[in-house]
């Protein structure tokens, strides 16, 4: 019984430490400016398009190339 109490106290302490670190990060962070947000959005959108295009190329290669061989 004492072991379970110690275990739960240790878990509570760990949760408290994690929450403190999350709060510290939130305090240090700032809202991005409009220009920063637009740049991040463009880069993320370009990355999504590139990954989609690569996936489409792989799909075409795996479905059409076997027909030629």
Swiss-Prot record:
The keyword Ligase does not apply. The keyword Chloroplast does not apply. The chain crosses the membrane at residues 43-63. It is a single-pass membrane protein. It comes from the Archaea. It is found in: Cell membrane. GO terms for biological process: intracellular protein transmembrane transport; protein secretion; protein targeting. Keywords: Cell membrane, Membrane, Protein transport, Translocation, Transmembrane, Transmembrane helix, Transport. InterPro entries: Prot_translocase_SecE_dom_sf, Translocase_Sec61-g, Translocase_SecE/Sec61-g. GO terms for cellular component: plasma membrane. GO terms for molecular function: protein transmembrane transporter activity. Pfam families: SecE. Component of the Sec protein translocase complex. Heterotrimer consisting of SecY (alpha), SecG (beta) and SecE (gamma) subunits. The heterotrimers can form oligomers, although 1 heterotrimer is thought to be able to translocate proteins. Interacts with the ribosome. May interact with SecDF, and other proteins may be involved. Belongs to the SecE/SEC61-gamma family. Essential subunit of the Sec protein translocation channel SecYEG. Clamps together the 2 halves of SecY. May contact the channel plug during translocation. This is Protein translocase subunit SecE. The lineage of its organism: Archaea, Methanobacteriati, Methanobacteriota, Stenosarchaea group, Methanomicrobia.
């Amino acid at each position: 019984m004492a072991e379970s109490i110690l275990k739960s106290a240790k878990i509570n302490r760990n949760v408290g430490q994690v929450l403190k670190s999350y709060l510290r990060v939130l305090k240090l962070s700032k809202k991005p400016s409009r220009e920063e947000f637009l740049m991040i959005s463009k880069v993320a959108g370009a990355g999504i398009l590139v990954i989609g295009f690569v996936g489409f190329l792989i799909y075409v290669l795996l479905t059409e190339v076997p027909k030629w061989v």
